[in-house]
Amino acid sequence: MVDEHYIDYSQLLAQLLDKDGELNETTVSFLYHLFPSDFFVRAMSLIDSNNMFIYVFERDETSAALTTSVGTEPDEVETTTETLRTSPSPPVASEQELGNAVQSSALINTLYEKPQSVLHRLIVKQEGPQSPPVCVDLRHWFCSCDEYNTLFEERMLTDEEPSLYSKATTELRAGASITDSFASMPPKGASRRYFRHDIIMCPHLLAFAILLQTTPELLTYFTHKAATVYLITIQNLDEWLKLHLNVVI
C-alpha cells in the first residue's frame, strides 16, 4: 500500500466530537458518505440503542469499588443502570464516586494504549428476545452476525486465488507515518497489518471501531456523558465464565 494515499479513518472518526465535547453534526454528515450501505447510520444507531456492552475482566483486586457485584446479563445491567439514572444525584460527589471516575478513565486509557493487555469481550444485545447476542472481535475484524458472514462467504471464499490472507489484509511498510488504528490487526514483525474493511464490514464492527479505535474521548462520551454504551468490569472469575457461557448458549 502507498501510505501517502491512505485515508486515516481513526483521525476522521475522532472528529465526531467538537472542541466543546459535543457531537459535530458537520462531521456526522460527512461520515455518512464515507462508508457504504448506510453502515455509518446503522452503527450510530447501535451506539445510541443501549444494546452495546464492553465487558472487561479486571484482575486488580484494588479496583473492587468499581466492579463489586456486577451482573453479566444484559437485562440485569440495563435495569441497574436505569435505576442509577433515575435516582436523585447527591449535590456533591463522594470520594468513592470520584475514585470510580478516575478508575474508569484509567481503564478507558488502557483499552486504547494497551488493548492486548486487557481481557475484554464486545457484545451487542439484539432486539428479538429469541435472538442470540452478537459477538465482535475487533482485533481480528470478526463479527458473528449474519451480515458479516454472508459478505465473507461472497467476497472471500468464492475464489481460491489469491490466498485468503492476501485478500483480507493489507500491510504498511515498516516506518510508515500512518497512525491509523481503524481495522488494525496484531502486527506481523515490523509491518502493521489492517483488515480490508472496504471489502467486509458490518454495523457492529464499525460501531465498536468508533468506540475503541479512534480516541478515548469518544469512548468516554458514549459511556459516561451520553451513557448509551455499557463499560462493565468483572473481577469474579465465575461471573466472567458465566458471561462466556451465556454467549455460547
Curated annotation (Swiss-Prot):
UniProtKB keywords: DNA damage, DNA recombination, DNA repair, Nucleus
GO biological process entries: DNA recombination; DNA repair
Segments of this protein annotated with the region Disordered: 68-95
Subcellular location as annotated: Nucleus
GO cellular component: nucleus
Family listed: Belongs to the SHU2 family.
Function: Plays a role in a RAD51/RAD54-dependent homologous recombination repair (HRR) pathway to repair MMS-induced lesions during S-phase. Required for error-free repair of spontaneous and induced DNA lesions to protect the genome from mutation.
Name the UniProt record assigns to this protein: Suppressor of hydroxyurea sensitivity protein 2
Taxonomic source organism: Lachancea thermotolerans (strain ATCC 56472 / CBS 6340 / NRRL Y-8284) (Yeast)
